[in-house]
Amino acid sequence: MPTHDANIQTRIEKDSMGEMPVPADVLYGASTQRAVLNFPVSGRGMPDAFIRAYATLKRACAEVNQKLGRLDAERTGAIAAACDQIEAGLSDHGGLARHFPVDVFQTGSGTSTNMNANEVIANLVCLARGEPIGSSKNAAYLQAGGVHPNDHVNMGQSSNDTFPTAMHVSAALAIAHDLVPAFDRLHAELDKKAQAWDRIVKIGRTHLQDATPIRLGQEFSGYAAQIAQAKGRLARALDVLSELALGGTAVGTGINTHKDFGRLVAEALTDRTGVRFREADNHFEAQHAKDAFVEASGTLRAVAVALSKIANDIRWLGSGPRCGIGELKLPAVQPGSSIMPGKVNPVICESVIMVACQVLGNDHAVTLGAFGGVGSVLDLNVAMPMMAANLLESVRLLANASDMFRENLLENLEPDEERCAALIEGSLAMCTSLVPAIGYDKSAALAYVAYREGKTVRELALEQKLLPEAELVRLLDPRSMTEPDAE
């Protein structure tokens, strides 16, 4: 266990296990300090988005407890004001990370983070009342209207229902406020390219081999549709995340809370955030399992797969510049090699693909965290901090990668129309359009001879006089091959 730094000034706080030296200027107390000493694992605290969501939740809980007649107006207002400071990032106190230091790899229920929030809120109230940090358990202070971390901030709650609730709230807010808008912007750019480039005909490719022609706009309309469908999947993820565990307290029975508490807090969160939340239909399922969270993470996996497909296709189509496909001209954003002068690499595409890989890894960790016998054991899941941190990282990475992809690549992406036309004319797949006129076998033989003699399908068909020239011109028009027959 880490030892105390003798140079750090401390104050003495107490919890149910006794006295604990705590750094003098931090807002947390004894329970949090024990967790700091117990879990020196990764050096990563819970994400800021999660801490802010916890503060939003604690505020809603206080307001509902007042509405139910369990908490007086003065304490409710004090707790709400403290939560506002946390939501704003505690900039006057050195930032969230300083006061929410508990490692991601902590107790699997997230109890340490819940107590961290309770203690910070209570100590912010102490400061607001002109009392020193650490006064929140002083009897005289409490009799005078002070706020206790457990009795008031945590009233009607348990770590076992607040932490899973904060998981859903933080994930839903991040998806709704960060990822969906980023995908709106990405979809708009892809759709813009699809419309602008619909006149450009190029060769299609299946199995990385030449296929029949396709319009560049058609390809990009497919990419735009992928993102539109991803947005639909995200909407469904928001729906499963909207169900909250709050109100179940320790094991789902609701001991020590009001029967309407969970419902009213969900309504308060909806009003405050603009994202819809509702009380869980079954609190035992909501606390004992994490199926909804796995489903939401799986949605992010599907979204990542879509992004990887688009980025990889553009990387292939931009390969070259002289010896690759070269149908797209990728913007040069940085030198690509320390040994090959003038080389420019598809670094933005590579970054997006790496993000997708990381999201898939995060999803696997989330899935394991919900797996029976690993995280989900009897009446509580005990891998929640890790699950929450991984899913929130996935949302952040996907949102940032989407904007980066759009700003640093798509907006300045250009087609090489001459290259597209040249590759179509040289493709053996052009013979496909002759099948209705001369049959499959003759078309296949034509393609074979054209390949062997280094000629285009058009040149050889004219030489062999297989069809009248006007008919050949009509059948070998590349654009006509990009639509179904009219009849």
Write out the residue ranges for each language-model feature.
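Conserved, well-structured ligand/cofactor-binding cores
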Residues: 1-487
